[in-house]
């Protein structure tokens, strides 16, 4: 049978419905979002919170967000660019940084709602699978659901590092261990040692040691920040352990100290301002006069 080109007729175009803008741009999965924000119809003024985890090339962003009719509201926010304050100055987008950012947003959110003292979470993580349980004669744990956006949920993904950090920070996040690093799909068991290694940056230390032996030039390039600070692979675990303790001591947000007015002026210096109608007329008249002289 010969190929017949599909002709899009007038009825096709008259019935065509465009998708939502953020769906067309590939930014929002509305199928998942609908199910994440759907609230029980017998609950009133009880927001359904979600842990939103997003990644850029250099940083990790974690937020506790609830949805209302007039938009999303952010309860707590944490960014991995805040981690140097706690001693983590390198690799701000890796698995361990995602864990630390999740821990930070969890402690910050619990402090805001007054549950930080009642739900401390896992103070010394050893890689075991634990869910936050309700305490007797007290308020229930703060419950959130993981929102991964368009991120692929592969086993060992960094998004689950952020979830593990938030869970160890005291939030109740319904989940199972089958997407953590070290989960064996055949035995359906979690290797605690492997997960602990990722929490304390052991996988980074192993990679550093491998590059030292196999490719010195690439090691010098990839870990230049650690080399400049005199940090070796066997020191990473202590650095991350101290950072987690500092996050628990003071999870509050601190401003960077930059002059906002100066920063705005610097950024606007390279932005071309849109001309007003009067300015456009003046420019046009000036060009006409200049052309007449020529």
From Swiss-Prot:
Q: Any one Gene Ontology biological process term?
A: ribosomal large subunit assembly
Identify the domain of life. Answer: Eukaryota
A GO cellular component annotation in the UniProt record: cytosol
Compartments it resides in: Cytoplasm; Nucleus
Where does it mainly reside?
A: cytoplasm
Please give the Gene3D superfamilies that the UniProt record associates with this protein. 3.30.420.100
Q: How does it assemble?
A: Component of the large ribosomal subunit (LSU). Mature yeast ribosomes consist of a small (40S) and a large (60S) subunit. The 40S small subunit contains 1 molecule of ribosomal RNA (18S rRNA) and 33 different proteins (encoded by 57 genes). The large 60S subunit contains 3 rRNA molecules (25S, 5.8S and 5S rRNA) and 46 different proteins (encoded by 81 genes). Component of a hexameric 5S RNP precursor complex, composed of 5S RNA, rrs1, rpf2, rpl5a/rpl5b, rpl11a/rpl11b and syo1; this complex acts as a precursor for ribosome assembly.
Say which species the protein is native to: Schizosaccharomyces pombe (strain 972 / ATCC 24843) (Fission yeast)
Q: Keyword Cytoplasm: yes or no? A: yes
Q: Give the UniProt keywords, A-Z.
A: Cytoplasm, Nucleus, Ribonucleoprotein, Ribosomal protein, RNA-binding, rRNA-binding
Q: Which InterPro entries match?
A: Rbsml_uL18_euk, Ribosomal_uL18_C_euk
The similarity comment for this entry is: Belongs to the universal ribosomal protein uL18 family.
Keyword Cytoplasm found: yes
User: What terms describe the molecular function in GO for this protein?
Assistant: 5S rRNA binding; structural constituent of ribosome
More info? There are 2 genes for uL18 in S.pombe.
Per its database record, what is this protein's job? Component of the ribosome, a large ribonucleoprotein complex responsible for the synthesis of proteins in the cell. The small ribosomal subunit (SSU) binds messenger RNAs (mRNAs) and translates the encoded message by selecting cognate aminoacyl-transfer RNA (tRNA) molecules. The large subunit (LSU) contains the ribosomal catalytic site termed the peptidyl transferase center (PTC), which catalyzes the formation of peptide bonds, thereby polymerizing the amino acids delivered by tRNAs into a polypeptide chain.
- This chain belongs to the protein called Large ribosomal subunit protein uL18B
Q: Name one Pfam family in it.
A: Ribosomal_L18_c
């Amino acid at each position: 049978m010969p190929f017949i080109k599909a002709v899009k007729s007038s009825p096709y175009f008259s019935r065509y419905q465009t998708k939502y803008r953020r769906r067309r741009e590939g930014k929002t999965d509305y199928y998942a979002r609908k199910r994440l924000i759907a609230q029980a119809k017998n609950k009133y003024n009880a927001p359904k919170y979600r842990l939103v985890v997003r990644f850029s090339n250099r940083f990790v962003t974690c937020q506790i967000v609830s949805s209302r009719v007039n938009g999303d509201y952010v309860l707590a926010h944490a960014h991995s660019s805040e981690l140097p304050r706690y001693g983590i100055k390198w690799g701000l987008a890796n698995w361990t940084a995602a864990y630390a950012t999740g821990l930070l947003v969890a402690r910050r959110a619990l402090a805001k709602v007054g549950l930080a003292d009642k739900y401390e979470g896992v103070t010394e993580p050893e890689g075991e699978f634990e869910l936050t349980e309700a305490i007797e004669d007290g308020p229930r744990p703060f419950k959130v659901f993981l929102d991964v956006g368009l991120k692929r949920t592969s086993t060992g993904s960094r998004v689950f590092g952020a979830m593990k950090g938030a869970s160890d920070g005291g939030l109740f996040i319904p989940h199972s261990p089958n997407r953590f690093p070290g989960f064996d799909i055949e035995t359906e068991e979690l290797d605690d040692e492997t997960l602990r290694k990722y929490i304390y940056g052991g996988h980074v230390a192993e990679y550093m040691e491998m590059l030292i032996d196999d490719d010195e030039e690439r090691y010098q390039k990839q870990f230049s920040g650690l080399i400049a600070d005199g940090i070796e692979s066997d020191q990473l675990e202590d650095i991350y352990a101290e950072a987690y303790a500092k996050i628990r001591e003071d999870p509050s947000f601190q401003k960077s100290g930059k002059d906002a007015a100066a920063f705005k002026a610097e950024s606007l210096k390279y932005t071309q301002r849109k001309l007003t109608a009067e300015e456009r007329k003046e420019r046009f008249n000036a060009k006409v006069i200049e052309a007449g002289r020529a």
